[in-house]
Every structure is written in C-alpha cells, then in structure tokens.
C-alpha cells in the first residue's frame, strides 16, 4: 500500500469512471484493458460494467515492483493509463484517439440541473411515543418482544459464518447462553502479525421517525449509530460515516423535499458532532405503482477501538447497579447534541475505568427491549422500576448500563439492579417474568422461517452387517507424529486460488509453536503453474505438517468443492512428495475445501 497513491473500484461506469475519476489529466489505452470476450468497440470498452477490479495510481518508477508484487499473489495486473499534466481525459483504442474531454467540462457534469423542493409539514404529535398493544404489562412486554423490529433473527443470522478470518471480537449473540444480541460488529484488523486494534461498526435508522420527518429520521440515524458504538466501549469522537439513501421516485416538489430534508438533518449532526461522512449507495427509484418506500437515510458509522476495552451487552454480575444514561430531546424533538456528547464521553470514561461492564443502546423496543435482551445472555435475575408510559417509547441516544459502582452524574438515573437468585427472573415494576419464557417469545416469530435448531436425524435403516445392538467400533487412526523429534516443527500451508482462511490458520499454527511456511499457487500462466508445483514440492519435502486450508474456487461447481486442489495433489511430483511425507511420519490436515480435496 505504500506504493499506491490513489485507488478506485470498478462498478457500473466501467473504465470511464473507475479510471476517469482518479486525476485531472489521463491518457487511457482501451485496447490494453483485459476483457472476457473479444469484439468490443471503444464505447463498450469505456463504459461496460466490470466488477472485482481495482484501479490504482503509482509512480512510474514503482511499476516493475508493483507488477512483481501482484504476480507473486496471483493477481492479474495491467498498465492501462498514464497520468498527464494536460488537464484532459483522453482515450485511445490502438492508434486512434477516441475521446478527448477537458476536465473542466467533465467536472461541470454537463448541463446544470435544477429541482424545486417543498419540505412538507410534519404531524403535530410526539413521534417518540409508541403504543404497544396489550391489556397488562405482561401482554405489552410479550408483544414488544414480537415486534418485527425487535424479535430475534438468530436463525437467519446463524446461516452466516461470523468467525471467518479469525478477527471477530464480539460474536453476534453474547453471554453464557449466547442469546443477547450484539449491537455492533467488532473485528480485529487483518494483519499477518498480532494486533489489539479493532474496528467497531454500527448502523442507525428508524422508518417510522423518518416517515414522520425525514429531517429528524436522518438526525436520529446518526445518533443511534453513535450510541451503539459508545455502548460497546468505543469513543464516538473519531467516527466516520457512510450514508445509504433510498427514496421514492422524484416526481414533484414534495417528493424532492424528502431527500433534501434528510440530507439537511444528517448534515446538522455532522457539523454538531464533528463527524464527517462519505456518500454511499443511493437510489431514487423506490416506487412501485402506488407504493413508496419510506424516506431512508441509514447511517453506518465506524471507528477504531482497543479490543481489550470492548464490552458486550449481556448482564455480568449479581449486585451490580442498572443506570439509564438518559437523553432528553429538545422541544422540537431534535437531538440535544451537547447533552449527548457529555453522556457519551461519561460512559466512555466509565468503561475505561472498568466501572461499566455492559451497556445497551436503546432502539426500536425502548427500555423494555434493552433490559429483556441484556438479561437473556447469562439468565441473571434483574429488577427495574420505571414509568410504564415510557417503557416502550423510542429513546434514541439513551443507553442502559450495568455499573459496579455508584454513578454520580446528572443524567444517570438508577432504575434497578442485577439481583441475587437462581430463578432467572426479570422483575419490571414488581411484575415477575421468567427469562426463558421471554426468550421463547422473542425468538418465536421467525422460528418457522429461520429455525435456530435442527431436529436430530435418525436413520431407520441398519447398515449391512450390523445387528443394531452391538455398537459399531471404527478402527481408531493413530494421529501421533512418528518422525524424528524436532525442536520446532514446520507447517506448510499452500495458498490456492480462492483460499480464504490461510492467515487465521497460520496464526493458529504459530500459537501452537510451529514454524509456518506459506506459498501462493499461481496459475495465470503455464510458467506460473510449473514454478508453483516445483515450489510446493520443495516445501512439502521440507515440512513436517502439510495443511490444506479452506476457501472457495471458481471451478468448484458443479459436482462439489475442492476439484482444483485435488488436481494439484494428483500431479505426480506433488503426489510423490506427499507419500514421502507420510512415509517419514509426517502429518496432513485439511479443513473445508482442503479436506474435500483430500477425500477426492
């Protein structure tokens, strides 16, 4: 990355955008651009969408070094443009000049566009008051936990691997029971060595507030994202944002008023918090016949944190106090940014002092959702007392914290404690709730669509030769190393196209005390393949352990995974080296794609 001065990703605009945006003066050579098929004319080469590509700017003197780095990682690299001082974007196809535009003209975006916007009046009501159906407190708590925006999506979430890359600091669900939802994504930075620096990312958006007022909706989207980050133990002060916008089709002044007011609301938060944003994906096509999407400006915020300072949201210890660090909106329902900054800084200080051990940023389900979900993870008894009229209201910016000490702060309201007891009971205003019943209610709505359990599979067919009474005893393999003793075993990890857990596997081996050797199997040219096979054979000959890591390769389907790796293993030189490894008592380990290749 020290060689790269600037970069851009390829997308819908193809070469014209990905390269054209990089600098003022450019000479672009369209005939050099790699294509999937021949016969494209100049226009098609210039504007065709192309994914999975990056454009980078380097100094001319670094060209050979850059190409060498790319080739060593099996990455295709092509010199397709030169930076000039002409202030013009020129495109050539062979010897022909096909485009010659001044940067001044490009930056003007062509003809100027104007649109008239009218910001509509909002309804005269408090948008934070939320009515939850139910005759009793129990009914309301149950209905709140089954709200589509509050109910558990654990079955859906567990369809995705949250551990790949070996960087996850907070799992999606925390606690001994793994049932308290985590509000942020915390990932250690990917590096070949070791680090405690992690990224922490959160989002914010409420379609009901945004429908009432896009201005307020955008402002509270930023507030919600910041609150979640603070509740995880990070500081909001260096957060950076990307806003994702989605609005109805723009047809009149009133429709134009919605993105205008949303952007103004977000901009106000940027200025008052001092937190910049870049634009994200945006669309003005959210209309189908007479159905419109709600005005959407979703805020995604990210910052860095020391992984050791991160706290998870589940309740931790009996006897701890529960405080609501309360945010009180201004008279016009906008966030009180000065109060929020003070609150967030106070919480961050208490987390760093190890006084606050868990926290939950209030969201769709209000305080009732927060205390229920915090109690799920460890099943600890807790008791709170709070005004039932405000229990379910939106309270964005407010954070419920578990503290080991008494908090002396004007906006810290003591509402309860984590109590002694083994009944797993949550008491709200004197009404007792069984925590496991609350969990069942919270997970029930989507359970049939996205189940979080699987029924055991029992085959009624007894395999031939077994009477179903005597247990089948498989011959146990002897997995001990039988070679000569070594002080530091060498583990060799070949990296094939598509391998994606090589870094995490290497760290695991180093932690276990092995010397790790890795080599990338390059296959861009025939010469690359021969060289990679020779290098792989040499490494197998010198290692004590061969590990085939997991991943994905484009040749996997149809007929299953691991075919590319299996073909390499069947090469005579590689096969002979593997047999020699086994003969000298060496060990082989395969995981995921690597294991499937061994089976094949």
Model-derived segments and their meaning:
Residues 5-22, 178, 226-235, 314, ...:
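Conserved phosphate/anionic-ligand binding catalytic regions in large, soluble enzymes, centered on
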Residues 1, 60-195, 202-210, 254-261, ...:
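Intein/HINT protein-splicing elements and their conserved insertion hotspots or analogous self-processing inserts
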Residues 179, 208-224, 568-572:
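Glycine-rich anion/phosphate-binding loops
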Residues 121, 215-282, 286:
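A glycine-rich phosphate/pyrophosphate-binding beta-strand-loop-alpha-helix module
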Residues 428-591, 595-600:
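N-terminal beta1-alpha1 cap of cysteine-dependent amidohydrolase-like domains
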Residues 1-51, 55-61, 285-311:
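Hydrophobic, small-residue-rich alpha-helical packing segments that form membrane-like cores
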Residues 1, 17-19, 28-43, 182-194, ...:
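Structured alpha-helical segments in the cores of large, soluble enzyme domains
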Residues 15, 33-41, 84-87, 282-285, ...:
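Short acidic loop-to-helix transition motifs that present clustered carboxylates
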């Amino acid at each position: 990355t020290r060689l790269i001065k600037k970069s851009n990703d390829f997308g819908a605009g193809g070469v014209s955008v990905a390269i054209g945006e990089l600098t003022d003066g450019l000479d672009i050579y369209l005939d050099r651009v790699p294509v999937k098929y021949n016969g494209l004319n100049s226009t098609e080469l210039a504007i065709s969408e192309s994914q999975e590509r990056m454009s980078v700017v380097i100094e001319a003197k670094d060209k050979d070094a850059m190409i060498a780095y790319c080739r060593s990682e099996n990455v295709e690299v092509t010199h397709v443009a030169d930076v000039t001082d002409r202030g013009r974007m020129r495109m050539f196809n062979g010897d022909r000049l096909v485009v010659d535009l001044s940067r001044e003209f490009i930056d003007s975006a062509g003809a100027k566009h104007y649109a008239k916007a009218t910001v509509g009046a909002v309804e005269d009501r408090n948008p934070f008051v939320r009515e939850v159906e139910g005759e009793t407190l129990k009914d309301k708590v149950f209905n709140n936990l089954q709200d589509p925006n509050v109910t558990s999506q654990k079955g859906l979430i567990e369809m995705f691997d949250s551990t790949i890359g070996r960087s996850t600091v907070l799992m999606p669900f925390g606690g001994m029971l793994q049932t308290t939802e985590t509000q942020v994504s915390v990932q250690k930075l990917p590096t070949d060595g070791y680090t405690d620096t992690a990224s922490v990312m959160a989002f914010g958006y409420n379609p009901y507030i945004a429908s009432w007022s896009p201005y307020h909706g955008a402002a509270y989207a930023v507030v919600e994202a910041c609150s979640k980050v603070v509740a995880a133990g990070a500081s909001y002060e260096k957060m950076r944002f990307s806003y994702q916008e989605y609005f109805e089709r723009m047809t009149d002044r009133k429709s134009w008023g919605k993105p205008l007011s949303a952007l103004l609301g977000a901009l106000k938060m940027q200025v008052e918090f001092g937190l910049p944003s870049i634009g994200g994906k945006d669309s003005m096509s959210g209309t189908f016949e007479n159905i419109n999407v709600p005005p959407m400006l979703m805020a995604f915020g990210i910052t860095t944190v020391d992984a050791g300072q991160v706290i998870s949201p589940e309740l931790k210890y009996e006897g701890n106090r529960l405080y609501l660090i309360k945010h009180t909106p201004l008279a016009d329902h906008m966030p009180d940014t000065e109060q929020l900054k003070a609150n967030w800084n106070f919480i961050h200080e208490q987390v760093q002092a190890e006084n606050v051990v868990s926290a939950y940023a209030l969201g769709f389900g209000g305080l009732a959702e927060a205390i229920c979900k915090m109690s799920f993870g460890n099943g600890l008894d807790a008791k709170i007392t709070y005004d039932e009229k405000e229990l379910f209201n939106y309270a964005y910016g407010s954070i419920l914290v578990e503290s080991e000490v008494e908090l002396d702060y004007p906006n810290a309201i003591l509402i309860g404690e984590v109590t002694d007891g083994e009944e797993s009971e949550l008491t709200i205003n004197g009404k007792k709730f069984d925590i496991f019943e609350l969990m069942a209610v919270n997970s029930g709505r989507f359970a049939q669509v996205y189940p979080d359990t699987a029924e055991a599979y029992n085959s009624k067919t007894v395999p031939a030769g077994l009477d179903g009474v005597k247990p089948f005893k498989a011959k146990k393999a002897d997995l001990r190393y039988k070679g000569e003793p070594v002080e530091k075993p060498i583990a060799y990890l070949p990296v094939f196209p598509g391998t994606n857990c090589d870094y995490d596997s290497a760290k695991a081996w180093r932690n276990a005390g092995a010397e790790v050797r890795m080599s990338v199997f390059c296959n861009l040219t025939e010469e690359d393949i021969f060289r990679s096979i020779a290098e792989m054979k040499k490494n197998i000959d010198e290692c004590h352990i061969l590990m085939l890591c997991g991943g994905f390769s484009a040749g996997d389907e149809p007929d299953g995974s691991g075919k590319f790796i299996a073909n390499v293993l069947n090469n005579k030189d590689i096969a002979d080296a593997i047999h020699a490894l086994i003969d000298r008592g060496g060990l082989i380990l395969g995981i995921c794609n690597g294991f499937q290749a061994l089976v094949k």
